[in-house]
Amino acid sequence: KNLVDPIKCTFDVQVYGKTIAQVVEAEVLRQLDKSNNNHIGYFHQNIFRHIGNGWVVPKEGYDVENGQRKIFVEMKNKHNTMNSSSSQKTYMRMQHSINKDKDALCLLVEVIATASQNKAWTISLDKIAISDERIRRVSMDKFYEMVTGDKFAFKRLCEVLPLVISDVVSSLKQSEIVQNTVLTELSAIAPDSLLKSIYWLSFQKYQGFDDFHFR
C-alpha cells in the first residue's frame, strides 16, 4: 500500500487550515493521478503494437521500433520531463544505434512538445552542441503522420478518445472500477482520530507507537 505521510498531513492541517479528511482525499487523488499517468504512458506506447506495418513494442530497449524501416523510438510525455543527464544518456544510446547501422533513424517523440516538429535533436555534450540528422526530436502529431501517412491521424485519435474511454469504463464491472475507501479504512483503525490512524499505519513498527496519543 502507498502510505499517506503523517508528518506532511500534520503540516497541511495546521498550516493550510484543512481538515484531515480533505488532506487525505487530496493525497489519494495525487496517488491515483500518478498511477493514471503510468497507464497513460502505457497507452501512448502500446497503441502502436496494434497498428501493424512493422511497428512493435519490444519488451526491453526502445519504447517503439520498426525493424523494417529501422526506426527506433524513445517516447516522453512532455518536452521538459528529461533533465540534462537523462537527455545525454538517451542521446548517447541513440548515437550507439546509428553507429551500428548507418541507415538507422532514432526519434525522441514527445506527446506534448513545444511545437509540431520533426527536426534534428541538438544537445550539449561537454558544453559542445552536437546534432545528427538521424537523431530527431519529433512531436506526437508528426510521429503519427510518419506511422500512418495521415497528417491528421493524431488529431483524429484525440477526437474519439473521450468516447472510447467512456465505452471502456461503462463496460467494466463495478468491482473493476477504482473505489476510494481510504477514509473508511482509516476510521476503522482509530475511530476517534483519522490523523492518529495515519501515524499508526506508518509508524506501527517504531518504538513506542503501540501506545501513541496526541497531546
Model-inferred region functions:
Residues 1-42, 203:
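Interdomain/boundary linker segments immediately adjacent to catalytic/signaling cores
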Residues 47-51, 94-101, 202:
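Hydrophobic, Leu/Ile/Phe/Ala-enriched alpha-helical segments that form helix-helix packing faces
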Residues 63-65, 107-108:
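A structural signal for short, well-ordered beta-strand segments and their strand-loop junctions
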